[in-house]
Amino acid sequence: MPDPFKLCILFGDSPDRPPQQISPGWEMAEVPVGIQLDPFQSNANWAAKRAEIASWNLPPIKASSHFLHHYGLVATGPGVDWEQLEFWTKRAFERLHVLDVTTVGVYGGFFRVREGFSRVEAMDQALRFCNMLADHARLYGITVALEPMGDLDTLWPRYLDGLAFARELGRSEVRLMADMNYFLKLPQPLEDIAKAPEYCVHCHIAGDHGQPGVGDMEAIYLRLFRILKDIGYEGGVSAACPWVSTVGGMLDFGLETSKTLRYLRDLRDRVYSE
């Protein structure tokens, strides 16, 4: 039997969720690039941020998200600035490498077909940007995980659309992320993940307007976990989600991350003992 997938948590994406309050026991962490690494910040500022991140005593930081963030950064459409994207991407991968990140999530919402803009040209831009990502990823042995996100005005809204795009791109550094909630959004069968197991390198999960365990979604988690077990997936399954208090009052992030970890661990143990 393959090793189980790893339980991962996104950190540092909102001020009401202090990373230092994350409960122990999570097996890996996911860093939001544009928020915590901000490639437009000076290297001196980055050194201070690295020290701050180290002080949080997080699990190994192996994944990332929020690759483009603010500053007018776009990957498709009339507003693309290639010089800006090149600087951002180069420095982002340098900083991700320092943290020992191995999987870089890239959101499908960055690849919209803007109103009045040629879809063919947008696709050419997307291919150019993803080749740029792959070039920098190759330098550090990093894998890029494209995240189809269910919006029909994007170039690859569905997981299988993303798979076709990644295959057309033809770069071994570029694979896919499976986000459970975006599968549900259109909807799409989770079994699509198993059509090309080697392409799935990261997963996102959430609850019903909150963290996993909020709402009645246990059957869906179990279905996803069984698929991941069957394909031998050993990457991260990341709680990348809004967080709410399940006990009333202000959010106690330490309490909720501990509760969610126990919930997910119990479900995973159930699946891997079958």
Task: Give the residues covered by each predicted segment.
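A broad helix-preferring feature
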Residues: 62, 74, 172, 176-180
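Short, glycine/acidic-enriched loop or turn micro-motifs at the edges of active sites
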Residues: 33, 150, 180-182, 243
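Conserved beta-strand positions
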Residues: 31, 106, 146, 178-180, ...
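Histidine-acidic metal/acid-base catalytic patches
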Residues: 1-27, 57, 83-86, 90, ...
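Short, solvent-exposed loop/turn segments at secondary-structure junctions
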Residues: 113-115, 153, 184-186
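Structural motif corresponding to the early beta-alpha repeats
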Residues: 27, 31-127, 211, 233-234, ...
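Catalytic-core regions built around general acid/base machinery
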Residues: 45-56, 126-137, 192-195, 223-228
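Hydrophobic, aromatic-enriched interface-forming segments
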Residues: 140-157
